[in-house]
């Protein structure tokens, strides 16, 4: 089957069409702006899969309707998913703009004095606003000389932020969310909302009963040679933690081996269901070999599967990580308990950064006073105002141990194309696999256990659906915190010492939901959240505005908030603007 091509960025150089001197004097400068923009984006960006980003430049500068139509025909044939219009001069506003209603679009008007690029920018944005097709404005802070071909830092920041978010929008469109199972333990996020996926993300939902996973395992609809490779890899790399179950619930070596085998099979089969596997066609399973074109998935597990079969912890942890028995590779997005809304936050984070995502329960707020009472330890540094215990039953990406290193030697989680095999091995070495707690998981399984290194910048996110309003996004930038080992042990054992932990300290602003750490916990909209490496809340805000998802909670500096220019016409408070604009324009794909 033909591989689906990746979305490209379209660059639209627009120009003053008056001949006999005006257009001729601007052709080279205008096209050079387009080429410089394309060079920047191809150098600085990659798709989440690691592939290079491609830009498509209009064959000619665009002065009016005819050239705009020719450009659109070219873009339509080359899978252009977002566009950037560039110009150093006056052009004819509504005659030259990109009119595709669902394609993210930005306009860079050169800040120069010789020709009025800013005037075109304002005129074109006015046309976008009047026609109900929002666009992003890019205008440099400082005047440049006409022959200055450099891209100022503030312009570069906006170009890259727009492009990252726009590529995420284009990459999600037309894909599916694989809902493997149904509602897990009444968790609202696993009540999968087809309208949300279709109208806001341009995605479909593929609903598959968990018996399909059972069928694939029982009928050997998988690559048996790969299973042996996976088992050998686990034998080499897995360190096992203590079994905290009562004696009558502990498994012998043969039973434990069977649980491990099925856990690895679950990972293989869920992966094959998401993306397909040509090797299944070789064994006569052509239909199954195609997969479901899923860019994200969720596995219900509890309780209809886990009361009888091994839980999804091992499968989900491996799939969400940037490596497995095949080496370093792009992480998958698989949501625990089929929490599709947390899955969407994971998907957004992965598309924006190319990194693995850490799925976690937002479990406990620990005040400084409570920690001192329980452990005798006084919190300081990043943790001085209290911390949130992010912990779940073992499905977090193993990258979350932060045993990878940035260029300065600091702990981090890298895009998968930058991860060495040694770093992958270090993450595995930092992880223990603990037998699942029988009270929770009667069918057994293994939960990964690691502790995230401290001092690492993270962004925690979550999508929620509010009746009468629609989807909203929550964002909390902060840092992981490292506690003294004895303090961690005391706190961790009060919850579950067989699961992975991140101690998280959000950055406080002193007002609203970020008045203090307690307020962050109190305002979090659900029981789950996602950690994405870095302080990337601004990218999430831009992406959300493209999809028309308002942000109900964030601690991003106001100067970094970047939304379409029309948002400014929806009031003077930027967060109120966001709600009114999203309501006014409605979901991007308006179903």
UniProtKB/Swiss-Prot annotation:
GO function terms (MF aspect): arabinose isomerase activity; identical protein binding; L-fucose isomerase activity; manganese ion binding
Entry's localization field: Cytoplasm
GO biological process: D-arabinose catabolic process; L-fucose catabolic process
Gene that specifies this protein: fucI
The species this protein was found in: Escherichia coli (strain K12)
Cofactor: Mn(2+)
Known EC number: 5.3.1.25, 5.3.1.3
The protein's name in its UniProt record: L-fucose isomerase
Residues given in the record as Mn(2+) binding sites: 337, 361, 528
Pathway participation: Carbohydrate degradation; L-fucose degradation; L-lactaldehyde and glycerone phosphate from L-fucose: step 1/3
Keyword Transferase set for record: no
